[in-house]
């Protein structure tokens, strides 16, 4: 066994369309702390970090206060509740880089280095923070731990599908009447999220497309709206569940323009370490911009596909 071990909570919620972790941090910071305590106890970890997005400075004050309250009650510190178990948790604010949402880039940043991904293997569980074994999970995952411990794994697994167990927090944004965060059972039809929970399309327009898992996953056309919201169903449809951010696009939108806006974000946020991403995003932007300006050619489609395959 290798010690010390570390727990890192990934609260660097930077994927466009995603805001579920922010709401958990804002409204129930002690749920996250409880989940981190349970995880640390199970894995014999004595030091935990909450790596928060740089723009979450207001939430860092809330989190620091909650940690102080937990220490005052004896839930953090030395010999917690007389068990001989020691644990302290610290917050750390990033500098706003999108790439630090990737676990190994987050670890580099937490160590004071450049926010760039590491080669894998070794994986963080073997060689993570300070080259020691590290458990790294996001806010939502750690917040589910207390429920599973209290109610039992069978109860949690009774929700969802055969391969996608439990529930999922989904951030619904875009052209809906009631954007927000909704907790659903895995396997719920995407149409249920859009038309029931989120109130339907704004101005009673028609659905044109939707991005089911944050801006980095492929968008789907409107005729796929009944796809169950779970890992295997979305994968079969040609996309991913991703970060759990459902972005709804109505028929007032030019999809080419939307694509250009998304590419511009990734072009700006590329950390520059890997050539396919660094150069590919710029070429994608230039080509799609030409199409947007009515200067496109049929051969551009093949070129775009070739660049995407290489990326």
PLM ranges: what are they?
Residues 1-39, 207-211, 249-252:
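Function-dense linear segments that define catalytic or interfacial modules
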Residues 3, 60-186, 198:
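Hydrophobic alpha-helical positions that pack around
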Residues 33-39, 186-204:
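Short amphipathic, charge-patterned alpha-helical segments
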Residues 11, 21-23, 47-48, 52, ...:
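Ferredoxin-type iron-sulfur electron-transfer modules in oxidoreductases and energy-metabolism complexes
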Residues 1, 158, 163, 171, ...:
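Accessory "access/gating" subregions that flank catalytic or transport cores
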């Amino acid at each position: 066994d290798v010690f010390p071990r570390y727990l890192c909570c990934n609260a660097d919620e930077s994927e466009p369309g995603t805001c579920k972790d922010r709401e958990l941090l804002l409204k129930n910071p002690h749920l996250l702390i409880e989940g981190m305590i349970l995880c640390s106890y199970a894995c014999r970890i004595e030091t935990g970090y909450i790596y928060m997005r740089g723009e979450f400075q207001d939430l860092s004050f809330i989190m620091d206060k909650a940690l102080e309250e937990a220490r005052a009650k004896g839930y953090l510190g030395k010999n917690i509740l007389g068990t001989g178990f020691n644990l302290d948790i610290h917050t750390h604010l990033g500098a706003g880089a999108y790439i630090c949402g990737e676990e190994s880039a987050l670890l580099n940043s937490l160590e004071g280095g450049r926010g760039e991904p590491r080669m894998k293997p070794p994986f963080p569980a073997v060689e993570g923070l300070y080259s020691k074994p590290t458990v790294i999970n996001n806010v939502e995952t750690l917040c589910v731990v207390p429920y599973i411990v209290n109610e039992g794994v069978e109860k949690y697994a009774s929700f969802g599908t055969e391969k996608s167990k439990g529930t999922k927090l989904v951030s619904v944004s875009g052209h809906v009447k009631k954007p927000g965060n909704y907790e659903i059972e895995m396997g719920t039809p995407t149409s249920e999220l859009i038309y029931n929970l989120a109130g339907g399309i704004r101005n009673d327009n028609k659905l044109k497309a939707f991005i089911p898992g944050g801006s980095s996953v492929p968008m789907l056309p409107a005729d796929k709206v009944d796809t169950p919201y779970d890992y295997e169903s979305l994968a079969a449809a040609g996309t991913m569940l991703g970060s759990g951010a459902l972005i709804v696009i109505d028929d007032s939108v030019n999809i080419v323009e939307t694509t250009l806006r998304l590419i511009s974000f990734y072009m700006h946020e590329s950390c520059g370490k890997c050539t396919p991403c660094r150069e590919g995003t710029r070429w994608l932007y230039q080509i799609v911009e030409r199409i947007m300006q009515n200067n496109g050619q049929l051969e551009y489609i093949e070129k775009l596909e070739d660049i995407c395959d290489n990326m």
